[in-house]
């Protein structure tokens, strides 16, 4: 995902969006209308919760946890968005303990809980006892799979890029900064002295 000034929590995590669904046509009593034994249907606008980049990566990380597979969420141009607004209460999840899990789980709201219950339906984590032991024996994994809380697993990596030369539209506060490991990546020493030919003319490049 690439952040920009209009990026917000709903476009990063998820939100209800209008979509069409084929639904039965009902009469005044709410009963499906039929022609013979065939129920009549028509497309109607309904609202569904649509998971966005963060929630997709979060669910995938837990689904592949027992396979020891890593899940990456890459954010481009993180300093072009209002991070405090975009992350919202997910900000707390960025504090990780020595085992790589979130130090402070957060409670999921009702809409998020329904989405997580649907996504985790039938999922079991074989290493649940090991994870629960990190949290003093609390059944934390069951709370995660039931959608009660959000907690980042240690196989979910969130990477972000920013161009320090750009004039940031939204300053990143120190509380947000300290929850990341920062690495400066210099410009790679690309091959120089290229000559590009265009319409019979040669142009020096780099």
List each model region and its residues.
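C-terminal regulatory/interaction module of P-loop NTP-utilizing enzymes
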Residues: 1-206
